[in-house]
């Protein structure tokens, strides 16, 4: 009799759990996301880009304005892989490759960046309100902005998602957009690495999203790139030179494309450079190339530079770069600013 009672109780418990656990899971999924976390970011100024020539300002076609070494005790700070500067040159939005937003405001003394204020971080949210990380949508490597809409490229799952940032801010939910079928052929750690939005009204390709693969290449070894949306969607290629890989891109106000590149060798070290691709060259099926604006190595103040953005200030075009420290104590999170020298 006791055995039968225990058995009946066990069956009853299983029945209750069968109903209660899914209901609890649904309630958990329905819970609102936590609010953004205010964080403190310490900023150490970088007075010279090349410590061997501390008074030098011109590097290639760029003039060094200043930089910062950024640190924070917040556990999710680091791994910054993309950046968008607001038109005011102070407010910014960035993303880490772990799927976290970072926004804040750069302070200046004259034209030199001196600190970061009003910094906040929050996890990116998927379509159902769960975090991207919980969906295993890893490596949020690229970002581009079109007004109130922010596009983010997710490397490991070969996706591009859009956020209604203007409406919901850091609590916006990702909405996948249609991407070219070729994305599925990219290596899992070499998919979409760079996104740039061609400004509306800047020419025939205005309103197009440009996506560039890190290690997706054609049979000649050139970088695969894509015009998505806009008036003339389709693939094109960027000439690969000197073994550099693409790490980010951004569009100038006239539509010209700035491509941030890097290469690393255990015996040669780390190098970065920026190329300018005229927008007039870009079209479906085209092979494009352009001049190098700057090339730097570890003799200068660089690290694993993964984000680039542009804004206008005082009649100058200002480039802001940020590095991904891979959450390593051996690397740094650098924010660097340059102005584009007149041609």
What does each of the following model-derived ranges do?
Residues 2, 6-8, 20-343:
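Sequence/structural signature of beta-propeller domains
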């Amino acid at each position: 009799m006791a055995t039968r009672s225990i058995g009946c109780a066990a069956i009853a418990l299983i029945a209750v759990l069968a109903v209660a656990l899914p209901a609890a899971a649904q309630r958990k999924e329905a819970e609102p996301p936590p609010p953004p976390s205010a964080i403190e970011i310490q900023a150490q100024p970088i007075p010279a880009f090349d410590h061997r020539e501390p008074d030098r300002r011109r590097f290639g076609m760029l003039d060094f304005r200043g930089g910062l070494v950024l640190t924070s005790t917040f556990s999710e700070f680091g791994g910054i892989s993309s950046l968008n500067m607001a038109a005011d040159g102070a407010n910014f939005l960035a993303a880490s490759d772990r799927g976290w937003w970072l926004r804040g405001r750069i302070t200046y003394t004259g034209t030199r960046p001196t600190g970061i204020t009003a910094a906040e971080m929050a996890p990116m949210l998927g379509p159902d309100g769960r975090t991207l990380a919980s969906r295993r949508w890893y490596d949020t490597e690229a970002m581009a902005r079109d007004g109130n809409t922010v596009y983010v490229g997710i490397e490991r799952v070969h996706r591009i998602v859009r956020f209604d940032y203007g409406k919901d801010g850091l609590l916006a939910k990702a909405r996948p957009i249609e991407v070219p079928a070729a994305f599925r052929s990219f290596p899992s750690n070499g998919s979409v690495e760079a996104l740039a939005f061609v400004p509306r009204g800047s020419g025939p390709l205005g309103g197009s999203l440009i996506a560039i693969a890190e290690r997706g290449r054609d049979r000649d070894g050139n970088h695969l790139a894509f015009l998505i949306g806009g008036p003339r969607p389709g693939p094109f290629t960027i000439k690969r030179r000197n073994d550099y890989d693409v790490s980010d891109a951004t569009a100038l106000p006239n539509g010209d494309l700035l491509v941030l590149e890097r290469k690393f060798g255990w015996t040669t070290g780390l190098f970065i450079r920026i190329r300018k691709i005229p927008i007039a060259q870009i079209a479906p099926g085209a092979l494009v190339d352009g001049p190098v604006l700057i090339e730097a190595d570890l003799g200068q103040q660089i690290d694993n530079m993964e984000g680039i953005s542009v804004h206008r200030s005082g009649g100058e075009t200002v480039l802001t770069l940020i590095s991904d420290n891979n959450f390593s104590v051996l690397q740094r999170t650098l924010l660097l600013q340059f102005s584009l020298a007149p041609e």
